[in-house]
């Protein structure tokens, strides 16, 4: 692994409406709130837990009403791995979260579906399937 980096620890979102964002990520997706911090400038920061070692940081007071479109230079999307895409889709639908891009087999050989958060940020859910391109690439790199 390059420079001994072992994982992505968190991603951060600057949002215009903290309550609306927490209702989506905490209440609908089920990411528990871990802690709240107040920065030196008085700004609040909320940490939500994705896994034991991965988090999303929510920074309120964002300007604008929507994430950049797909063609804009910026972070394009976040992908969250799930063990069962159909169960995830059922959960999303039960929470009233519209499926933006329906389930399909991606070019990498994995199942995926997409949603948008309340600010338009794109979220991909991916179920890794046996024999996927990532698995093949890891095997190739491990053998060289």
Residue ranges and their predicted role:
Residues 1-8, 32-79, 89-116, 129-144:
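Vicinal oxygen chelate
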Residues 21-26, 92, 120:
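Conserved active-site tyrosine of GNAT-family acetyltransferases
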Residues 125:
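Short glycine-/small-residue motifs
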């Amino acid at each position: 692994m390059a420079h001994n980096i072992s994982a992505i620890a968190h991603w951060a979102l600057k949002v215009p409406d903290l309550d609306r964002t927490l209702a989506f990520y905490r209440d609908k997706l089920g990411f528990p709130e871990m802690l709240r911090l107040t920065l030196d400038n008085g700004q609040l920061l909320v940490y939500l837990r994705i896994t034991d070692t991965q988090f999303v940081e929510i920074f309120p007071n964002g300007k604008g009403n929507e994430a950049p479109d797909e063609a804009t230079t910026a972070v394009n999307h976040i992908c969250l791995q799930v063990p069962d895409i159909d169960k995830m889709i059922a959960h999303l639908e039960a929470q009233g979260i519209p499926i933006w891009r329906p389930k399909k087999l991606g070019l990498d050989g994995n199942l995926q579906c997409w949603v948008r958060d309340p600010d338009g940020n794109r979220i991909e859910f991916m179920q890794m399937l046996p024999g996927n391109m990532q698995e093949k690439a890891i095997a190739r790199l491990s053998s060289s």
